[in-house]
A protein has these predicted regions:
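Flexible helix-coil transition and linker loops at the boundaries of alpha-helical arrays
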Residues: 10-12, 80-92, 119-121, 152-162, ...
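Generic helix N-cap/helix-start motif at coil->alpha-helix transitions
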Residues: 17-22, 50-52, 88-94, 121-128, ...
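Alpha-helical repeat scaffolds
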Residues: 40-43, 71-85, 108-118, 142-155, ...
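Inter-helical turn/loop elements of alpha-helical hairpins
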Residues: 2, 15-20, 25-42, 46-50, ...
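Asp-box/WD-like beta-propeller blade repeats and closely related beta-sheet repeat scaffolds
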Residues: 111, 115, 121-124, 129-134
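Tandem amphipathic alpha-helical repeat scaffolds
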Residues: 25-27, 53-67, 95-104, 126-140, ...
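Helix-coil-helix junctions within alpha-helical repeat/solenoid scaffolds
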Residues: 248-447
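Internal metal/ion-chelating core segments
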Residues: 149-253
Length: 447
């Protein structure tokens, strides 16, 4: 033991204050999305080359991006961290246990390992951040809330990352349909000076699910400075996704021009650095297509910048489904069929969570989307309605998975499953107040 502890009282196995400070700055970047943490982690390694945690943090950060091209770098960092475990303390070794499971594709097992770590280390924000991220990727709404709830009473405003932990909790509450509590916690997270994009995001989700599209547009405009530049850096790394939410509020108002403006500002093809940004772009363009909005060359630009070789498939069914949407939207029917085959094969050959998801949900969902793209709307409707009750398995949020629901409504309207479409619309109308978009679907399904 070195006697050093981090800002939240967790013992660390480095004797270098510089290494500790750099690692804590990297953790803040992970939770705030202000700048990539890799430079800070490199600084921590330079200050103490024998400390395993910065290498583990780099591995976890890269794995969390679900980016196929970064997997090799992630595994290399994890290998270095494992070689240095002799000097690591019990908490740091527990992170390595979770990361090994994560690297092997066992997302649920990794989440359980982080939960076990948090029992004895309730203020380990790294375990909270990573556990929360993969709860989100697994669509586990209950654990998004419960993981943070189990430790939140051990936190207070005295701890610098407390607002960011509140942001995690707010999102977990929202995904658990506890909308009033979620909004209150999200607003509380933003009551001080901390800029917490995840809390802004949680409140935006509340407003989306409640059909408060005008409130949502005002909210995003009011909090814009909190996901802008900080200390001369580029805009917040979460800006693309928050811009996606801004576009959804515009769509709910049937402001198609506003949605396209948000797309061009926050999700243009030349600004995409990772697959998660391309996923948001594909989801938004698809929703516009469902409404009959002309999007110009945006589909083609999106696909042109998206690495979609066979080696890119199989890491995340959620990402693979959105890549298929992009190919269909761009009119690349041959490539779309090839992508389904590659993603299905990669899923079957893989291990862990993604293999199960691709087999149970991803592959049949992709076949339904291909049918939709081919104009076989009844086949698409039959495929999608059979999957909807288990759609959370795909991962992501309620708002993100609504693209499947809207595709199903469109298939019913365009094909002969009109009675099914009306029943699904009735279900939707009971859950959300009237908005221009909801009324548009009512007219479409009554035609």
């Amino acid at each position: 033991m070195t006697g050093l502890v981090d800002a939240h009282g967790n013992a660390v196995s480095t004797a270098s204050r510089g290494a500790l400070e750099s690692s804590e700055r990297a953790l803040w970047r992970m939770m705030s999305f202000y700048g990539a943490p890799t430079d800070d982690l490199d600084a921590a390694v330079a200050a103490d080359p024998a400390w395993s945690l910065p290498h583990a943090m780099k591995a976890g950060f890269l794995l969390g991006l679900t980016e196929p091209s970064l997997r090799g770098d992630a595994l290399a960092a994890l290998a270095v961290a494992e070689r240095l475990t002799g000097g690591a303390n019990e908490r740091e070794r527990a992170h390595l246990v979770a990361l090994r499971l994560l690297a092997a594709g066992d997302w649920a097992g990794a989440g359980a390992a982080w939960n076990a770590l948090l029992v004895d280390n309730p203020r380990d924000a790294l375990a909270l951040q990573w556990g929360h991220l993969f709860d989100f990727y697994r669509g586990d709404a209950a654990m998004l809330r419960q993981r943070v709830a189990r430790v939140l009473p051990e936190w207070s405003d005295d701890f610098p990352l407390h607002p960011y932990v509140l942001g995690l909790y707010a999102f977990g509450l929202e995904e658990s349909n506890l909308h009033g509590e979620a909004e209150a916690v999200g607003r509380h997270a933003l009551a001080g000076t901390a800029r917490v994009p995840w809390a802004i995001h949680a409140v935006a989700h509340v407003m989306e699910m409640q059909g408060r599209h005008e409130d949502g547009r005002r909210w995003m405009a009011h909090r814009r400075a909190d996901w802008g530049a900080l200390d001369g850096e580029l805009r917040n790394g979460f800006a693309g996704h928050l811009g996606w939410h801004e576009a959804l509020f515009a769509l709910e108002s049937l402001d198609h021009a506003g949605a396209l403006t948000a797309y061009d500002a926050f999700l243009p093809a030349d600004a995409h650095e990772i697959t998660l940004q391309r996923v948001d772009a594909a989801s938004l363009l698809w929703r516009l297509d469902l409404l009959g909005v002309e999007v110009g060359p945006r589909w083609q630009a999106l696909v042109a910048g998206w690495p979609l070789g066979d080696e890119a498939a199989g890491q995340s069914a959620f990402n693979d489904v959105h890549a298929l949407i992009a190919l269909i939207g761009a009119g690349e029917s041959r490539r779309a069929r090839a992508w389904v085959a590659a993603a299905t094969a990669a899923g079957a050959a893989g291990a862990g969570w993604n293999r199960a998801v691709m087999g149970r949900l991803g592959a049949p969902l992709m076949h339904g989307l291909v049918a939709f793209g081919q104009g076989r709307f009844d086949a698409a409707a039959d495929a999608l309605v059979a999957l909807r009750d288990g759609a959370a398995l795909l991962g992501g949020s309620h708002a993100q998975r609504d693209v499947i629901e809207q595709t199903l409504l469109s298939a019913c309207a365009r094909g002969s499953r009109h009675a099914l479409g009306r029943a699904l619309y009735n279900e939707r109308s009971m859950a959300r107040p009237a908005t221009p978009l909801r009324d548009w679907w009512a007219r479409r399904l009554s035609a």
